[in-house]
Amino acid sequence: PGSDTAIMGIFGCDPRKYFSGRAPLELAASGGVMPEGGAAYRCNMVNLGGPEGAPFEERIMISHSAGSIEGEESDELVTWLFAQPDFAALAERAQLTVRPGSSFRHLAVQERADIAGIVLAPPHDHLNEKIGPLLPSGCANAEVLLGLMRKAAELLPGHPINKKREAEGKLPANCIWFWAEGKGAALPNFPARFGADGGVISAVPLCHGIARLVGLEPVSVPTATGEWDTDYEAKTAAALDVLAEHDFAAIHLEGPDEATHNHDLEHKIYSVECLSERVAKPLCAALRERGEDFRLLILSDHRTFMANGAHGGTPVPYMIYDSREMGPASGLGYTEKNGESGPFLESGVELMPRLFCL
């Protein structure tokens, strides 16, 4: 289970019908165009551990985000990497270019790419595992991508940014990791289906790509980080700005997920508390002050487990609040346990019609 298919479902797009890969959705966020016959991939900056001098296959996936590397450092590293003669020659033969992105998240676009049968593993689902069984496989093009990853592992450790990160006790971005391949994306129009236009506030390219493809406005907040320390007040204010002119706003918070991938229970709890105290409560209060009726949907796109830092596919609890209904409603608090006794939906695709009372 991934955020790509889950968030598509939340916006009413059945992933079984429309999903063709995560990277094309993120490419749409940047306004990029998929070349005919080409493919896009996520290109993560990652940290690999293991004994010094160990074969590449014996390395360990320590961090899918290179220790939540900052955007400026990450962009500089990936741009430098693709400019190094040995790496650039491999990338040119592969007809592959990079589009620097958000934090550890970059995109690679390949002309005339054959991805039939390719197997690329999501790094966040395999933390602290040996990478040998996770390396690209399944077709000749997988070997091309693997060659680029091997070369990156040779070159990146020596970059001054990584030396500086190590000196500061941070994880270096010592490799790249290709995954989330896809050929193209087209999604049904949200305003036409639900009779409401608006915007999506997020620090994550995936959400902005889905927004653009369904006909909603991607809204960026300069002080949003995509981590537990994001600017919650600014994201709430951005949603209120959208709702001043439109009928729909979505706020995406990545903090709980990233904290869990990093086995950081303290900041996972903190992020959830901030959702309640610094987003939901002030948002509702401001809308009431405006004298507007509204409905509010709160949910996570998927579960992420502290035990292993990986995603889970079991159903998530959701809550719908209607400002016009002042009665007790279900009388249940919003918890995983109470969610088990609430109305069960077979698919996330059913949520948006439920929010709009369709």
Where are these regions (language model features)?
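Anion-binding catalytic surfaces of enzymes that hydrolyze or transfer phosphate/sulfate esters
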Residues: 116, 183-267
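Active-site proximal loops enriched in glycine and acidic residues that flank catalytic Cys/His/Asp
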Residues: 222, 252-255, 264, 276, ...
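Loop-centered beta-sheet repeat module
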Residues: 129-197
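Metal-dependent active-site segment of extracytoplasmic phospho-/sulfohydrolases and closely related
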Residues: 271-314
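Flexible, glycine/charged-enriched surface loops at secondary-structure junctions
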Residues: 91-99, 159-171, 221, 248-249, ...
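Active-site nucleophile/metal-coordination loop of metallo-enzymes that catalyze phosphate/sulfate
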Residues: 1-83, 310-313, 319-322, 328-358
